[in-house]
């Protein structure tokens, strides 16, 4: 696929999958120390890892507790079998999790996971514990491009970061600077000198705090820095010898904003968006902004809600599918007394409030559950079947929040106008859809 946007969207889906996996693995707990976390970095050898596992097997054979010994040996064997699936370490490295976990009902369940991460994982790890270790995976997500922001005005300064679609305020402080003085004579010179001194101290304090916030272990911890503010403070800082040279070389944009503080930070993100280009926060705002634009222009080229969006997908009408990354909808596949499959999408609240949907209309009994899975996971696997692009969004931007609260966190930008009312009339029963 040569389309960079499509590649970016696919990468975002991979990132989303890893986020979900981390959540699941972090929650898992074992009985004893039989949960194996194995990470092999790129360019390492499968044979080295296999040799190490063989040695571990020998050591584990001496564990005194019979139950724990058997669990550990079983987990090592599962890990060895996973390794046999690979002739060599994939370009981005290899991550393997194997072991027995305790389910919420207290039963033991085997977990065997192996995958190549979406970007190189430069960590070598082997741990046998009562939990899975996901720290290296979490770092992989965090090491997305991060930008630093310094917003200065006459009332104070704010230090912030933007990474992916996560915006953080790292530090802020207020300042009380004397205003320009109107009196003449010697007092005017004295006030001007005092004022200049206070401004100088303010710029110096910002320069010092910039080092504290944006340099870790003598290395700049952001991809680039945006200086923002009203008046000349940002330019004074940029030109000042007090501003650490390592940071000065990272300044990618200087922008004028009308406010200080958090509002100024938001405005600076907007104004620097072109320079930041690929940061997901901006992409998210643009994408949902485009969705809202279709609504305000009344083009009819949008859909929202699970059911209408699925109908539009079935028609092949959805150009871009937009889904909230934490959408809590379950996809149920049920079977009625005639053997017909019925698919229902519902939230936990809907399940509790409306059990009628699960009842067979002819017999009045509950229908057989064929399968039950997260709608998000299902759509992440099947979106390509509908000829659409899938974009996950957060609720951290104003637009994202509005999309989740006002439109249920799922919708699409359509290739052409679809008359959903007409489609609903065609459906005999708009609660159930056959595949």
Curated annotation (Swiss-Prot):
Keyword line: Cytoplasm, Protein biosynthesis
Example of a GO MF term: translation release factor activity
Cross-referenced InterPro entries: eFR1_2_sf, eRF1_1_Pelota, eRF1_1_sf, eRF1_2, eRF1_3, Peptide_chain-rel_eRF1/aRF1, Ribosomal_eL30-like_sf
Subcellular location as annotated: Cytoplasm
SMART domains, alphabetized: eRF1_1
Taxonomy, superkingdom: Eukaryota
SUPFAM superfamilies, per database record: L30e-like, N-terminal domain of eukaryotic peptide chain release factor subunit 1, ERF1, Translational machinery components
Annotated Gene Ontology cellular component terms: cytoplasm
Pfam families attached to this UniProt entry: eRF1_1 (PF03463), eRF1_2 (PF03464), eRF1_3 (PF03465)
UniProt-listed PANTHER family: PEPTIDE CHAIN RELEASE FACTOR SUBUNIT 1
Quaternary structure and interacting proteins, as annotated: Heterodimer of two subunits, one of which binds GTP.
Family the UniProt entry places it in: Belongs to the eukaryotic release factor 1 family.
Purpose of the protein: Directs the termination of nascent peptide synthesis (translation) in response to the termination codons UAA, UAG and UGA.
Protein name (Swiss-Prot/TrEMBL): Eukaryotic peptide chain release factor subunit 1
Species this protein is from: Podospora anserina
Gene name of the record: SU2
């Amino acid at each position: 696929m040569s389309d960079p946007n499509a590649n970016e969207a696919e990468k975002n889906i991979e990132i989303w999958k890893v986020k979900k996996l981390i959540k699941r693995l972090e929650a898992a707990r074992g009985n004893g120390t039989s949960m194996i976390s194995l990470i092999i970095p790129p360019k390492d050898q499968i044979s080295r890892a296999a040799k190490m596992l063989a040695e571990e097997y020998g050591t584990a054979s001496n564990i005194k507790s019979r139950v724990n010994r058997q669990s550990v040996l079983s987990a090592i064997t599962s890990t060895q079998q996973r390794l046999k699936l690979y002739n060599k370490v994939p370009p981005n490295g290899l991550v393997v999790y194997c072991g027995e976990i305790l389910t919420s009902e207290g039963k033991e369940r085997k977990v065997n996971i192996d995958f190549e991460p979406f970007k190189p994982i430069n960590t070598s790890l082997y741990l046998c514990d009562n939990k899975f270790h996901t720290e290296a995976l979490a770092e992989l997500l965090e090491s997305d491009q991060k930008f630093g922001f310094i917003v200065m005005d006459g009332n104070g300064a704010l230090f912030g970061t933007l990474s992916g679609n996560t915006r953080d305020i790292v530090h802020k402080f207020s300042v009380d600077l004397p205003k320009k003085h109107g009196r003449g004579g010697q007092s005017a010179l004295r006030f001007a000198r005092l004022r200049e001194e206070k401004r100088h101290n303010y710029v110096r304090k910002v320069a010092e705090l910039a080092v504290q916030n944006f340099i870790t272990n003598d290395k700049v911890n952001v991809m680039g820095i945006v200086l923002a503010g009203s008046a000349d403070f940002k330019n004074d800082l940029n030109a000042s010898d007090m501003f650490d040279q390592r940071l000065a070389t990272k300044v990618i944009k200087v922008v004028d904003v009308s406010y200080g503080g958090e509002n100024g930070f938001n405005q600076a993100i907007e104004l620097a968006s072109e320079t930041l280009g690929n940061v997901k926060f901006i992409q998210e705002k643009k994408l949902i902004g485009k969705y809202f634009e279709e609504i305000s222009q009344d083009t009819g080229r949008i859909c929202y809600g699970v059911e209408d969006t699925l109908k539009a997908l079935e028609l092949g009408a959805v150009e871009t599918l937009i889904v909230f990354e934490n959408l809590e909808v379950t996809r149920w596949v049920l079977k009625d007394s005639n053997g017909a499959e019925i698919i229902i999408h519902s939230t936990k609240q809907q399940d509790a409030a409306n059990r009628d949907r699960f009842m067979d209309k002819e017999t009045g009994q509950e229908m057989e559950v064929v399968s039950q899975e997260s709608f998000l996971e299902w759509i992440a696997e099947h979106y390509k079947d509908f000829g659409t692009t899938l974009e996950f969004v957060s609720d951290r931007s104003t637009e994202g929040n509005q999309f989740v609260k006002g439109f249920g966190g799922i919708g699409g930008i359509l290739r052409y106008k679809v008359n959903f009312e007409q489609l609903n009339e065609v459906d005999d029963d708009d609660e159930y859809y056959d595949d």
